A protein has these predicted regions:
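Single conserved hydrophobic/aromatic residue that forms the stacking wall/gate
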Residues: 1-7, 314-317, 321-323
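Glycine-rich phosphate-binding loops that contact phosphosugars or nucleotide phosphates
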Residues: 3, 41-190, 271-278, 282-312
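Active-site phosphate/pyrophosphate-binding segments
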Residues: 13, 17-47, 116, 127, ...
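Gly/Ser/Thr-rich helix-start
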Residues: 51-53, 59, 102, 223-225, ...
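Histidine-centered active-site/metal-ligand motif
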Residues: 56, 244, 255, 314, ...
Length: 323
């Protein structure tokens, strides 16, 4: 597990560049945009297409974009998108997420969307790549080269960029006031410092990793935005530590996954904030007790002000803004 930390500090610290230059005179600005505010106001449905970690960043985007814009969002694996004949048209926006901008399945999804007259907005890290060239608008993540074997800083940069897309849509559609957009943008700016504070716990994280280095299987569970984070955590463990791992929505444990839990199995719990998420937080505490009763060893990742989870918590994250 501790292998997951190799190079992560260097990679993640660069993600703050994603925000640079995207908030000018109180407005969200995209890098290359051939979509007017009027075009964005006409959007009736949004598809997010991506693969791997980019797909998980899209799952996170769904929560924010729907909340901020009240436009329905579907998340699709790019490799499946064009084969199921999705309903697309001029009032559909397809957000294509790709670190390289050359992901073959995502590129084909973009081409299919364009053939159906849908609008396409690319979220990409590589200037001049094929996907942004074939899209109507582009938001570059400016995360620099991805050095790690697995996507680390690219994932965080994509999450931030997707939130910027949501804010740009909300701004154009008038579903968020300018001062609300500014507040959320400032909270995104503060993310870099909060990531730094988590990285300051590297020694503790390595210690936890060493405790479970002999494990053959880990489960990750989360609710709401914690569910995509659980999926991403499991993917990272598979890619970097070569350990079998699966991510699940915590509410689905009783529908099958709990049968996998046996004595000593590590279960990583993404604990929601107790602020404004009291119901979800209470349910996650119940999930922790549920897996512990079946012999699991829990690794709970929680906010540093979460007193209710303190007896279960090994790693504390830092409070984030809620909008």
């Amino acid at each position: 597990i501790s292998a997951c930390l190799v190079g992560s500090e260097m990679c993640i610290r660069d993600s703050a560049d994603t925000l640079r230059g995207h908030f000018v005179d109180g407005r969200i600005v995209l890098d290359e945009r051939r979509l007017s505010d009027e075009d964005l106001r006409q959007i009736e449905k949004i598809f997010v297409v991506a693969c791997g970690s980019a797909y998980h960043s899209g799952l996170l985007a769904k929560y924010a974009i729907e909340h901020w814009t009240r436009v329905p969002v579907e998340i699709e694996l790019a490799s499946e998108f064009r084969y199921r004949d999705p309903v697309l048209g001029p009032n559909t926006l397809v957000v294509a997420i790709s670190q390289s901008g050359e992901t073959a399945d995502t590129l084909e999804a973009v081409r299919h969307a364009r053939s159906q007259k849908a609008r396409v907005l690319a979220v990409c890290n590589t200037n001049g790549a094929q996907i942004p060239r074939e899209s109507d608008a582009v938001l570059y993540t400016h995360a620099g080269p991805e050095i790690a074997v697995a996507s680390t800083k690219a994932f965080l940069a994509q999450v931030i960029a997707n939130y910027l897309v949501g804010l740009a849509l909300a701004q154009a559609r008038g579903t968020k006031y300018p001062d609300e957009v500014a507040v959320i943008y400032r909270e995104l700016e503060a993310m870099a410092e909060k990531v730094e504070r988590v990285l300051d716990q590297t020694d503790d994280i390595r210690s936890i990793g060493r405790q479970f280095a002999g494990s053959n299987t880990l489960l990750f569970i989360g609710r709401n935005v914690g569910y995509p984070v659980a999926l991403e955590g499991a993917l990272k463990l598979k890619e970097l530590a070569y350990i079998h791992a699966e991510g699940f929505a915590a509410g689905e444990l009783k529908h099958g996954p709990i049968a996998l839990i046996d004595e000593g199995m590590p279960v990583v719990v993404i604990m929601p904030s107790p602020k404004g998420r009291a119901v979800l937080h209470s349910k996650m505490i119940s999930n922790v007790k549920e897996v512990q009763a079946r012999g699991a060893t829990t690794i709970v990742i929680a906010e540093d002000n979460d007193e209710a989870a303190v007896s279960y918590t090994h790693l504390r994250a830092h409070e984030t803004g809620r909008n």
